[in-house]
UniProtKB/Swiss-Prot annotation:
Sequence similarity: Belongs to the conotoxin M superfamily.
PTM (free text): Contains 3 disulfide bonds.
Main location: secreted
Subcellular location: Secreted
Protein name: Conotoxin tx3d
UniProt entry tagged with the keyword Secreted: yes
Length: 16
């Protein structure tokens, strides 16, 4: 899974 602010910054969506 891709969760966390760092994940969002890496273009991982949707963000948890």
């Amino acid at each position: 899974g891709c969760c966390g602010a760092f994940a969002c910054r890496f273009g991982c969506t949707p963000c948890c």
